[in-house]
Amino acid sequence: MMKNGVVVITGASSGIGKSTAEYLSKKGFTVYALARRMDKLEDLIPLGIKPLFLDVTNETSIKVAIQEIYETEGRIDVLFNNAGYGLYGPIEDVDLKDARDQFEVNLFGLANMIKHVLPIMRNQGSGKIINTSSIGGKVASLLGGWYHASKFALEGFSDSLRIELKQFGIQVVLIQPGLIKTEFMQRTYDYASKIDAQSPYQDTIAHVMKSAERDYLTGKVGSNPIVVAKVVYKAIKARRPKTRYRMGKLSFIALTARKILPDKWLDYILLKR
């Protein structure tokens, strides 16, 4: 496909986004790394990566960033929508404002980025939109109701988008990482740990927190973000990319279990984890 295209990455201040920015830059792409935490992008500048401020929940911020990139480069070949986070806690206990904020970042902000990039890609007659979903977009886990709802929604959104954009030569790809060593788990842990001590779900929360402390927060479980970066590169270079790519720890096991196990069997396994 393209040799040196222009790639725009959201959520590029850490983890998957930052690793992908570094990897694609080394492969010869012109990379724009977008994030709110500009201080976290400074070390990317010596690599030739161009940092820009972006708040995906702010219309003006999106418009300004895309306009600056287009005026400088004259094109945008790839949009990698990676900004997102996980909100974990009992559905009953999570404040609805927090739940709406989850959707604003994980779905509506992503959709707004796409709406601003599409006219550019359509005018080019080509482009790729890569959306970061998760195995959590196919398999729901304990306390993850609002996060999973946002990712399940993203899966359906991306499927419809893919069909709509085919006529314009624009491809849509979903990536479904498993457990990756990023700040994701720390943030989910922090929120869940602040749930009211009088919650009727305290035993459940304690169970999940213990599992998180044992496996995820210690770094014992999870793949290096570079595995995602390599898959994103593969999807960009592919003439006919897959509609979905899965990678990372537990992704194959979790998605296979979802396909072959009855719902109640999977519920039992997830409750015991």
Where are these regions (language model features)?
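The beta1-alpha1 cofactor-binding region of Rossmann-like NAD(H)/NADP(H)-dependent oxidoreductases
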Residues: 54-64, 96
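Substrate-binding pocket helix/loop in short-chain dehydrogenase/reductase
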Residues: 90-91, 98-100
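Residue(s) in the substrate-gating loop at a strand-loop-helix junction
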Residues: 134
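A glycine-rich helix->loop->beta "capping" turn
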Residues: 68-81, 87
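Conserved glycine-rich cofactor-binding loop
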Residues: 13-14
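Active-site helix of classical SDR
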Residues: 114, 150-153
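C-terminal beta-strand-loop-alpha-helix "lid" module of Rossmann-like NAD(P)-dependent dehydrogenases
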Residues: 166-216
